Amino acid sequence: YSPAAAAAVVDASPLAEGRGEASLVRELERDTTAAGTYPIVLVSYSLACTTYEDPATAELVKAFLTYVASEEGQQQAAGAAGSAPISEEMRANVMEIVDSIS
Protein backbone atom coordinates (compact mmCIF):
# COMPACT_ATOMS: atom_id res chain seq x y z
CA TYR A 1 0.00 0.00 0.00
CA SER A 2 1.02 3.58 -0.72
CA PRO A 3 -0.90 6.82 -1.19
CA ALA A 4 0.10 6.78 -4.87
CA ALA A 5 -1.27 3.24 -5.27
CA ALA A 6 -4.57 4.29 -3.68
CA ALA A 7 -4.83 7.28 -6.02
CA ALA A 8 -3.90 5.09 -8.99
CA VAL A 9 -6.87 2.74 -8.55
CA VAL A 10 -9.21 5.74 -8.57
CA ASP A 11 -7.62 7.09 -11.74
CA ALA A 12 -7.80 3.66 -13.39
CA SER A 13 -11.48 3.16 -12.55
CA PRO A 14 -14.11 4.25 -15.08
CA LEU A 15 -16.48 7.14 -14.56
CA ALA A 16 -19.92 6.09 -13.33
CA GLU A 17 -22.53 6.10 -16.09
CA GLY A 18 -25.70 8.18 -16.05
CA ARG A 19 -24.24 11.19 -14.29
CA GLY A 20 -23.87 14.78 -15.45
CA GLU A 21 -20.81 15.91 -17.35
CA ALA A 22 -19.56 17.75 -14.24
CA SER A 23 -19.36 14.48 -12.29
CA LEU A 24 -16.17 12.63 -11.44
CA VAL A 25 -17.89 9.75 -9.60
CA ARG A 26 -16.02 6.50 -10.27
CA GLU A 27 -17.06 2.87 -10.41
CA LEU A 28 -14.11 1.61 -8.39
CA GLU A 29 -12.50 -1.49 -9.84
CA ARG A 30 -11.78 -3.26 -6.58
CA ASP A 31 -10.87 -6.46 -8.42
CA THR A 32 -8.14 -4.85 -10.50
CA THR A 33 -4.83 -6.59 -10.91
CA ALA A 34 -3.18 -3.55 -12.49
CA ALA A 35 0.36 -2.97 -11.29
CA GLY A 36 0.86 -0.11 -8.88
CA THR A 37 -2.72 0.02 -7.59
CA TYR A 38 -4.23 -0.66 -4.19
CA PRO A 39 -7.96 -1.39 -4.65
CA ILE A 40 -9.13 -1.12 -1.04
CA VAL A 41 -9.95 2.58 -0.86
CA LEU A 42 -12.75 4.82 0.36
CA VAL A 43 -13.45 7.79 -1.88
CA SER A 44 -14.86 11.04 -0.51
CA TYR A 45 -16.66 13.39 -2.85
CA SER A 46 -17.33 17.13 -2.69
CA LEU A 47 -20.62 18.28 -4.15
CA ALA A 48 -21.38 21.72 -5.53
CA CYS A 49 -23.75 23.34 -7.97
CA THR A 50 -22.39 24.36 -11.36
CA THR A 51 -24.28 27.68 -11.31
CA TYR A 52 -25.25 30.05 -8.51
CA GLU A 53 -27.60 33.04 -8.54
CA ASP A 54 -25.14 35.09 -6.49
CA PRO A 55 -21.72 35.50 -8.14
CA ALA A 56 -20.11 35.97 -4.71
CA THR A 57 -21.38 32.54 -3.66
CA ALA A 58 -19.94 31.01 -6.83
CA GLU A 59 -16.55 32.57 -6.07
CA LEU A 60 -16.59 31.27 -2.48
CA VAL A 61 -17.44 27.75 -3.66
CA LYS A 62 -14.70 27.90 -6.29
CA ALA A 63 -12.16 29.12 -3.72
CA PHE A 64 -13.08 26.34 -1.28
CA LEU A 65 -12.93 23.57 -3.90
CA THR A 66 -9.70 24.96 -5.33
CA TYR A 67 -8.10 24.72 -1.89
CA VAL A 68 -9.48 21.24 -1.23
CA ALA A 69 -8.03 19.99 -4.53
CA SER A 70 -4.74 21.88 -4.16
CA GLU A 71 -1.53 20.17 -3.17
CA GLU A 72 -1.60 22.08 0.14
CA GLY A 73 -5.20 21.07 0.85
CA GLN A 74 -4.47 17.46 0.02
CA GLN A 75 -1.38 17.42 2.24
CA GLN A 76 -3.37 18.93 5.13
CA ALA A 77 -6.04 16.24 4.71
CA ALA A 78 -3.41 13.51 4.53
CA GLY A 79 -1.81 14.74 7.74
CA ALA A 80 -5.08 15.19 9.62
CA ALA A 81 -6.97 12.13 8.40
CA GLY A 82 -4.34 9.84 6.91
CA SER A 83 -5.98 10.11 3.51
CA ALA A 84 -4.21 9.55 0.20
CA PRO A 85 -3.81 12.74 -1.86
CA ILE A 86 -5.44 12.80 -5.28
CA SER A 87 -3.22 12.43 -8.33
CA GLU A 88 -2.19 15.30 -10.59
CA GLU A 89 -4.50 13.82 -13.25
CA MET A 90 -7.47 13.93 -10.87
CA ARG A 91 -6.54 17.43 -9.71
CA ALA A 92 -6.60 18.62 -13.34
CA ASN A 93 -10.02 17.00 -13.84
CA VAL A 94 -11.36 18.59 -10.66
CA MET A 95 -10.02 22.02 -11.57
CA GLU A 96 -11.57 21.88 -15.03
CA ILE A 97 -14.98 21.46 -13.39
CA VAL A 98 -14.28 24.01 -10.63
CA ASP A 99 -13.22 26.58 -13.24
CA SER A 100 -16.58 26.13 -15.01
CA ILE A 101 -18.63 27.09 -11.92
CA SER A 102 -20.43 30.38 -12.37
Q: What do these predicted regions represent?
A:
Residues Y1-E71, A78-S102:
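Flexible, solvent-exposed loop/hinge segments that line or gate ligand/substrate-binding clefts
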